């Protein structure tokens, strides 16, 4: 019969797969502008085994919204946010939020993000007809000296409810709770980099592997005890 340690260890295999996937996804987005790393919160399998819990451990994933480093690009349509604000983009499924500001213009000169989604201003989609484009800290967009719109910057009372969609988009289950990000500023000609620290992720991966190896030992130990028990019964 499997004891509590082995039951927990078996469950940990599935958890380790999810954790490894999370780490791999973080590492693959080290160079993705505005990417926010996922953090796996894993209840140690060894701790559970020592306490003889019957249930396998729980692991949850949360998003780290710590800012990435600001990188100067010199591109007039690259925008970085200083503060806790988000850009708004329009998708076929509704409004989404992002920190990734590597924008461009489509054939109709509508401001779009890297995925081709329209970036929203206070008046809706932003069309930029002109040559000299200036974006001020408060989001005001001037084309050839004339203000055409102001980029919508919003935030939420808490970011815990935001859900990832793809690599750099976020969905809010309660978009009505968005408020103007008055304390945030836009920096033109710059991008916010990913907040992934490759060294930290590799250390997390090593820790995950150590937990995996510990699980192996627990299961092997239990199998050895089972084998001995069967042999003893066979001698009776």
Report the location of each language-model feature:
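Amphipathic alpha-helical polymerization modules
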Residues: 1-236
């Amino acid at each position: 019969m499997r004891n509590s340690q082995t039951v927990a260890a078996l469950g940990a295999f599935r958890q380790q797969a999810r954790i490894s996937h999370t780490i791999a996804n973080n590492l693959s987005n080290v160079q993705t502008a505005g990417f926010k790393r996922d953090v796996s919160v894993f209840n140690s399998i060894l701790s559970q085994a020592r306490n003889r819990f019957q249930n396998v451990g729980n692991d949850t994933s949360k998003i780290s919204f710590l800012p990435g480093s600001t990188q100067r690009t010199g591109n007039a349509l690259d925008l970085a946010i200083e503060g806790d604000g988000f850009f708004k983009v329009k998708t076929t499924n509704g409004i989404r939020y992002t920190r990734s500001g590597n924008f461009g213009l489509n054939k109709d000169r509508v401001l779009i993000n890297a995925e081709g989604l329209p970036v929203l201003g206070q008046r809706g989609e932003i069309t930029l007809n002109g040559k000299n484009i200036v974006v001020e800290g408060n989001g005001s967009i001037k084309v050839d000296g004339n203000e055409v719109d102001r980029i919508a910057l919003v935030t939420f009372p808490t970011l815990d409810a935001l859900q990832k969609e793809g690599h750099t988009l976020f969905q809010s289950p309660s978009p009505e709770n968005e408020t103007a990000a008055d304390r945030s500023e836009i920096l033109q000609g710059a991008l916010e980099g990913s907040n992934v620290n490759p060294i930290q992720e590799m250390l997390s991966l090593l820790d995950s592997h150590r937990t995996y190896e510990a699980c192996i030992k627990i299961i092997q130990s239990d199998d050895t005890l089972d084998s001995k028990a069967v042999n003893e019964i066979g001698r009776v």
